[in-house]
């Protein structure tokens, strides 16, 4: 394993196990340097194991955002290059962490793995950042031209924009990171990953000419901005193209559920 949390060689599972254990047991394993195991507790709300932490360690930059700090604890490990849907500020508390970031447009050069079976929730690059196999993944050489890396010590923090790919290497017997995720969309907004899944089920099965036609339609209704798509439609007649409100989002969600069930 060499500290790399990843898929099994046959991609029929993972090269690590998942278990629930008391926090004290995790600390005991990390305190025993002769244990030899790679141990990792990821993305745990501080309120679950460190009550009062959030109140004593507020992050003013995101104080107004609907977020709560999460804590990551382990020893030396490598987390594959992936992206998160939320903006992120990550703060190193103990140990050293090296972050390598790639802009979203490098997705094709990063060779992402499965969408529905993932190491930690989001698609992960199949390239080993510490030892890239450029014969198997030749386009990764282009991705490296766009990479940005930073090595963080205790007290350092890094801002990772939403959808930026990032790989993380942790070193040290006791490594701790606290991060703050947030989004600038309403809490009841849908996840773009769900939209991706629906698109794979529908648009992804169409011939190329129809896929390109749908690209133009999505550009008009989604990517060009809502106002450009509706400025010629009377406001009272805009329907789901109208101004986004909690009521409208609820209606849209119910509509989508009915449509998916009907198919």
Regions found by a protein language model. Name each.
Residues 1-157, 167-263:
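N-terminal accessory scaffold of Fe(II)-dependent oxygenases
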């Amino acid at each position: 394993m060499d500290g790399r949390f990843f898929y099994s060689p046959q991609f029929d599972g993972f090269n690590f196990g998942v278990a629930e254990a008391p926090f004290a047991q995790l600390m005991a394993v990390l305190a025993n340097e002769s244990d030899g195991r790679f141990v990792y507790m990821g993305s745990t709300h501080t309120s679950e194991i460190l009550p009062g932490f959030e109140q004593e360690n507020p992050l003013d930059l995101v104080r107004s955002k609907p977020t709560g700090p999460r804590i990551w604890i382990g020893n030396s490990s490598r987390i594959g290059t992936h992206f998160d849907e939320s903006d992120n500020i990550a703060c190193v508390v103990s140990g050293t962490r090296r972050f390598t970031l790639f802009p979203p447009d490098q997705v094709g050069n990063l060779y992402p793995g499965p969408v529905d079976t993932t190491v930690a929730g989001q698609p992960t690059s199949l390239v080993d950042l510490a030892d890239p196999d450029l014969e198997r993944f030749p386009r990764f050489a282009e991705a490296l031209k766009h990479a940005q890396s930073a090595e963080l010590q205790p007290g350092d923090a890094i801002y990772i924009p939403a959808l930026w790919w990032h790989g993380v290497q942790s070193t040290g017997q006791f490594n701790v990171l606290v991060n703050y995720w947030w989004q600038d969309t309403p809490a009841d907004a849908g996840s773009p990953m769900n939209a991706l899944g629906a698109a794979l089920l529908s648009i992804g099965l169409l011939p190329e000419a129809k896929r390109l036609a749908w690209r133009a339609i999505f550009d008009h209704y989604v990517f060009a901005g809502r106002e450009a798509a509706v400025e010629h439609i009377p406001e009272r007649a805009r329907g789901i193209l109208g101004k986004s409100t909690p009521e409208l989002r609820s209606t849209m969600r119910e509509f989508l559920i009915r449509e998916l069930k009907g198919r």
